[in-house]
């Protein structure tokens, strides 16, 4: 309790550095969780590797079931940089394998930071690098609201501008399709798709649904659709 109180007071007083000593494992996680609960601010938790980050992510998800606990690590399952071997005069091209689920979780982390205040992002130290201008990313968000006026062509253009691809056959992550007056969009950061019904250029309904079964889950008065990638720039 003393450590929790002192750490919380230090944060409220804008202390630049604080160190927690004498606690290991889950005890340290619990202590920091109580500090987060006391301070009530968005929090970034950094670990030194992916394995520990995954463990911390699971622990914080259990400790904060109603918060936006997010996971932000490198999405590469495998990465080989460009290289040159002078002995054999061989140039090796860059090669990599990207994990789609990790990419989804990374985008979900940044979208949560723009939507909510109760955010805890668990990351690895290797992810401390720039992702571009957050203001530019935020400006590209598409806001869909019931009874708002929008044409099919305008919504299509907005979606393409934020790197969603049209695919009228298969609805996959980062894709959308158009079925008459209905847009079905699979956000890059969600596990559910949304169905937007537009009639006479007016949004009639916004519904979340399972992209595999088509089962509808919840209706929305409004929905914020975030870009399908982090590196994004102004059209100008």
Feature map (PLM): residue ranges:
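ASCE RecA-like P-loop NTPase motor cores
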Residues: 1-236
């Amino acid at each position: 309790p003393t450590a929790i109180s002192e750490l919380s007071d230090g944060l409220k007083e804008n202390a630049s550095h604080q160190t927690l000593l004498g606690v290991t494992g889950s005890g340290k996680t619990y202590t920091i969780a109580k500090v987060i609960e006391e301070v009530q601010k968005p929090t970034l938790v950094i670990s030194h590797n992916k394995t520990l980050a995954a463990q911390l992510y699971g622990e914080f998800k259990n400790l904060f079931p109603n918060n936006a606990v997010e996971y932000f690590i490198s999405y590469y399952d495998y990465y080989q940089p460009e290289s040159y071997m002078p002995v054999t005069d061989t140039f090796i091209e860059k090669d990599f394998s990207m994990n789609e689920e990790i990419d989804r979780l990374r985008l979900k982390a940044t979208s949560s930071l723009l939507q909510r205040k109760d955010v805890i992002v668990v990351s690895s130290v290797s992810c401390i690098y720039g992702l571009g201008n957050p203001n530019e990313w935020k400006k590209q968000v598409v806001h869909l609201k019931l009874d708002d006026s929008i044409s099919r062509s305008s919504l299509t253009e907005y979606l393409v501008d934020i790197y969603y691809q049209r695919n009228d056959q298969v609805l996959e992550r980062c894709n959308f399709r158009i079925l008459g007056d209905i847009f079905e969009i699979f956000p890059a950061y969600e596990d559910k798709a949304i169905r937007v019904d537009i009639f006479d250029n007016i949004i009639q309904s916004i519904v979340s649904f399972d992209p595999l079964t088509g089962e509808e889950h919840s209706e929305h008065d409004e929905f914020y659709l975030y870009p399908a990638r982090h590196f994004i720039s102004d059209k100008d």
